[in-house]
Each structure stands twice: as C-alpha cells, then as structure tokens.
C-alpha cells in the first residue's frame, strides 16, 4: 500500500490500491509518483511495524524521530515540533516525556518503544493507520495496554485502522470488519460477528480453533501443510 517494497526489489505486477487523499484526491497508489507518495507516507497513511527496535533509528533521539514528520509534513518549527512531540508522548501514556524525548531507542523497554512508534505514526493525524502485528513481540500485559491505546486514539482522532494479525483474540477486540488471507489471497470477508459465529473457509475455522479456551484440553488437527518454496521437485 505504501510502496515501501519498491526499495527492496519488490514490484507490483497487477491490481490497484485506491486511496482518497485529502491533498491529491482519488488516486491509485500503485502508479503514484515519488513526490505524491512522499507527501502521503507518514502524513495521510502511517504504519506501526511489528518490531519497534528495528523500526526506530538507533543514532537519533526519540524526540528527533517524532519531530521529523511534524517538521516535514506540518511545516512546524523545531520549537513547535518539540512541544507537539512532548504532547504526543503524554498522549501514549509515557511518563517523564522531557527525559524520554532526549533518550535513544536502546534505553527504552519494548512496550515503551512501541508507544513511541504509535506516537510517531499518529503525529500528523493520518486518515489511515496500518498496524502490522504491533503487539506480537510484547508480553500479554503490555499487549493489552498497546491495544487499548490504539483503540482510544483511533476513536479520538477518527482514524481508520487496518490491523494485520494472525491472533484471532486480537481480531475479536479490535475489528469491525475482517478479511481472511491465505497464501496471499482473500478467502473470506465479513463482519467480525459473521467471521466468528459462521466461518465459511477451512482456514478461517483453523484460525479460530487455535484460540485457547479455558477448560478445553482437546487438540485440533493441524491445517493442511502448505509448501513455502518448490525447487525442481523439492518442497521446503
């Protein structure tokens, strides 16, 4: 969607990604030029990645990394961006914002780094937030806190959230509508109630069967094994 794969050898071979941009109107992101994409990334579409330690730059302070998008997209001065950065750190419930803004990523815990990523992603109040497995690397207590923050900010800022996850427990908490993907293709779509109460595709049922249930010790058969790579008859 954000065309980040362009920089790692990826290529979009067919299809469209239609987006209603506040600045450029309706456009197809697959054919948008670099200037248009640069104005949209981080401004109208933002992303929270799975592992914040590899997403944050280790040689810049937390405050500088949040302020960067505010200066670039919002036209703020350095002083204005600093003030807004501190407000964002408070909004994601990080204490001692002044000290944290001058800290480097390695000095923060995993949960704190992910809160910084949320603050950075929502700094320009995007219309779409893509959350790619944002809680997978966190323990369940921190996971619940992060999900609650995303939900509250989504409501307060009126931001649409595309949540990518394999955890159906998270889907039940966060989603209104669900699209189930299998082997890169959409196999089922519906409201969260339809998916959970009347799943149609075997893969959807397998995902739901993987959710732990209190008092249940009965195992479920594994889904059909899918090869990752086939090389001259050898399956990996």
What name fits each language-model region?
Residues 26, 192-236:
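Charged, flexible cofactor/metal-binding loops and thiol motifs
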Residues 177, 189:
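Short, glycine/charged-rich "phosphate-handling" switch motifs in NTP-dependent
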Residues 16-28, 80-99, 208-209:
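Conserved ABC ATPase "signature" region
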Residues 123-127:
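A short, proline-enriched helix->beta-strand linker immediately N-terminal to the Walker B motif
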Residues 171-173:
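A short, surface-exposed alpha-helical micro-motif characterized by mixed small hydrophobic
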């Amino acid at each position: 969607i954000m065309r980040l794969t362009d920089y790692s050898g990826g290529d979009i071979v067919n299809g469209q990604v239609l987006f209603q941009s506040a600045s450029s109107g309706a456009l197809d992101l697959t054919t948008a030029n670099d200037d248009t994409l640069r104005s949209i990334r981080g401004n109208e579409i933002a992303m929270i990645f799975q592992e914040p330690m590899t997403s944050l730059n280790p040689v810049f302070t937390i405050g500088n990394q949040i302020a960067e998008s505010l200066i670039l997209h919002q036209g703020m001065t350095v002083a204005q961006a600093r003030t807004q950065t501190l407000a964002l750190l408070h909004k994601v419930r990080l204490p001692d914002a002044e000290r944290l803004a001058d800290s480097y990523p390695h000095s923060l815990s995993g949960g704190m780094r992910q809160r910084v990523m949320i603050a950075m992603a929502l700094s320009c109040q995007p219309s779409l937030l893509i959350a790619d497995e944002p809680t997978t690397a966190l323990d369940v207590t921190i996971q619940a806190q992060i999900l609650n923050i995303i939900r509250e900010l989504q409501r307060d800022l009126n931001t649409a959230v595309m949540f990518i996850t394999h955890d159906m427990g998270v889907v039940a908490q966060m989603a209104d509508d669900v699209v189930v993907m299998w082997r890169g293709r959409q196999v089922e779509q519906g409201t969260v109630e339809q998916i959970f109460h009347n799943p149609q595709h075997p893969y959807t049922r397998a995902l739901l069967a993987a959710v732990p249930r209190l008092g249940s010790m009965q195992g479920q058969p594994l889904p059909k094994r899918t090869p990752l790579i086939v090389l001259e008859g050898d399956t990996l």
